[in-house]
């Protein structure tokens, strides 16, 4: 019984992961969710701005909590692979595609890996300062 329950759980989890990779038809066109390496509002703005200029992309919305961008597009004008490649050219990972290093190097500091994990250095005050 326990093995069956475990098997069913793995199958459902695998199905959900696979479903995220497949385009879903919506009223405006097709929709796909792409995992990114975005970490802040500037990342969100950069990705959504750049995707707005990709031919065939109708809309995009990046959820920073999950680091997933949902893109609605016209399949006659673009495809998921082209959209992923566009994201990598901005400097971010897109599903299994690695970001372009030159683009990453030009990102603001807050958009780079570990930028939000680094504590702000404290400068010691000299005697008599700060009062």
Region annotations inferred by a language model:
Residues 21-23, 127-131:
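Short acidic DE-rich linear segments
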Residues 26-38:
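Short glycine-/aliphatic-rich beta-strand segments at the starts of folded cytosolic domains
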Residues 38-46:
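Conserved redox-active cysteine motifs that mediate thiol-disulfide chemistry
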Residues 11-13, 34-37, 104-105:
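Processing junctions and N-termini across compartments
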Residues 1-26:
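Bacterial Sec-dependent N-terminal signal peptides
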Residues 59-105:
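Mid-chain, structured segments of secreted extracytoplasmic proteins
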Residues 47-63:
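Short acidic amphipathic segments
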Residues 104-128:
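Short, low-order "capping/linker" segments at domain edges
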């Amino acid at each position: 019984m326990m093995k069956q329950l475990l098997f069913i759980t793995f199958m459902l989890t695998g199905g959900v992961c696979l479903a995220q990779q497949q385009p879903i038809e919506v009223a405006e066109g097709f929709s796909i969710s792409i995992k990114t390496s975005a970490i802040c509002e500037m990342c969100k703005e950069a990705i959504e701005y750049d995707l707005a200029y990709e031919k065939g992309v109708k809309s995009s919305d990046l959820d920073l909590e999950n680091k997933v961008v949902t893109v609605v597009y016209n399949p006659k004008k673009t495809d998921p692979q082209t959209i992923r490649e566009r994201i990598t050219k901005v400097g971010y990972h897109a599903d299994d595609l690695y970001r372009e290093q030159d683009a990453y190097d030009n990102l603001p500091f807050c958009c780079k890996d570990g930028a939000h994990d680094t504590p702000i250095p404290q400068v010691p005050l000299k005697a008599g300062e700060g009062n």
